[in-house]
Amino acid sequence: MSFITVAGAKPLLDGIKGRLTEAIKGERDKGHSPAMAILRIGNDPASEFYFRAKLKKASELGVETRAITMDEDASPQDVMAHLDQMIRDPLIQGIMIESPVPGQLDYKTLVNRIPWYKDIDGASYENLGRLMSGMPALVAATPLAVMEYVSSFKIPTGSTFAVINRTITVGRPLSQLLLNSNFTPTVCHSKTRNLAALCRSSDVIVVAAGKPGFLGSEMVTADSIVIDVGINSVKGKIVGDARFDEIKDIVKYITPVPGGVGSLTSNLIFSNLLQAMGYQEERTKQIS
């Protein structure tokens, strides 16, 4: 697959959609019905947007969804009761909890209640631990989206990566995926010394600092590949963490924001659902 310097997501997105459509049809032909549950608590506008976007995407792909919406003042006990019901339901293969949740609830507690094999957000500590241990796991969609780009760029094994993020949802799982693929990642953060020099010496820079304009021309070279994971709102406009206009004519490749990594994530959740179905099928065989 060839890309111009600005590597938009459309070629990758078309490929992912094609794979998903074929795989979901295959499951249906075998008599299986991919189904997921999405739990939303409260009235957060951003949560509402993503909630509806997932329902729309599921409908397009032919995935059954059970959408549960609870009031802003829902008690932890009531939320847990609904969550446990989803967990016990054998017809639901994947569960997601929209964030943020209201103040009386703890998102991490809720997510870690979900068995790893139904946690299609890849947000539980167990899934992260399984990934780090080389065991079957469901991985968060953002690191998976980065790996889709890595694969398409045909980056040689052994290449060096500067991963500017150390969170358990992006930097840490991504670094493990890179290691598993025989790349050489360095996880960077706000206290990393000589970060600009480290970025310049790396083959690939994955920037997810959460700061608009963080990555500038002083941190890249003509051979740099920049994968921008940042999503920031600046004066009503969505921008990444890289100073896009400043470096797009310098670097080898750069992913845009919007239209880059973020465009892939909603589809990769459904890839996780299919993977979850496989894990649950294996568990059923082992139990029986």
Regions inferred by a protein language model and the residue ranges of each:
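Short beta-strand elements in bilobed, periplasmic/extracellular small-molecule ligand-binding domains
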Residues: 58-73, 185-188
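Anion-binding alpha/beta catalytic cores of soluble intermediary-metabolism enzymes, centered on
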Residues: 6, 96-157, 198
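Glycine-rich phosphate/diphosphate-binding loop of Rossmann-like nucleotide-binding domains
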Residues: 41-53, 137-225, 234-248
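Short beta-strand segments enriched in small/hydrophobic residues
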Residues: 33-42
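Rossmann-fold NAD(P)-binding glycine/threonine-rich loop
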Residues: 108-128, 230-280
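C-terminal helix-to-coil terminal segments
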Residues: 2-7, 11, 264-288
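Positively charged, low-complexity intrinsically disordered leader regions
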Residues: 1-32
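Short, well-structured alpha-helical segments in soluble
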Residues: 78-90
